[in-house]
Amino acid sequence: MSNPDAAYKSYFRDSYDAFAIASDSHIKWIRAEGLKDRYEVSHATKVLVPKPSGLLRSIALLKVEDQIVYQAIVNVIAEELKKRTKQRYEKRVFAHLYAGKSSQFFNIKWQNSYKKFAARLRDCHSSGYDHIANFDLTAFYDTIDHHVLFHFLKELKIDEETIEYLIRCLRKWTSSTWSNGPQNIYHGHGIPQGPLVFYA
């Protein structure tokens, strides 16, 4: 499948359709509840998806309302992060480039960056470099410590209340259960690898 996001979205096709019927009302409700500190995120459902290597990747399925909350927080973070990373766009970093508030899409169109990435590879090869390193960074997402994330978001000057709320959300979304266990286990690390709404 060429678009990994399509697989994630397939789990929610009916939910997205139902949400869309009254999306304005739903979004206003989420906002109102959030402003009153009453919106409570739900635990994520975990799905294990086979990787080409034969290993399994855990994907967190967040309910639609939680996806919107997550996206709203990520938008705030991305805006601040862009101020620090923009100078590296299409020079050292070529993937998942934040498009900015004014864009309809979260990321810059990848095809343009890919052309520049390919040109950069050719330039490096012409300069005598003959090795390429390939990393599976998505495996890293499960190990991101929430205390470390808090530290770096604070360094970015993200509002502390927003960071604390995000950490509470992440704690719930990344918790685990035993198959017969009576309650969730909160381990304080990881960020959901789905939704990929911020990559769409």
Question: What do the PLM-derived regions correspond to, one by one?
Answer:
Residues M1-P50:
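Non-catalytic, polymerase-adjacent accessory regions of viral genome-replication enzymes
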Residues A6-F12, P50-L55, P182-G190:
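A short, surface-exposed helix-loop junction/capping segment
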Residues E40, P50-L56, Y114-F117:
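Short linear interaction motifs
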Residues E40-T45, K83-R88, E161:
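Short, flexible active-site-proximal loops enriched in glycine and acidic residues
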Residues L56-R92, Y141, Y186-A200:
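Conserved pre-motif C helix in the palm subdomain of viral-like polymerases
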Residues V74-N134, A139-D145:
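Active-site-proximal segment of RNA-dependent polymerases
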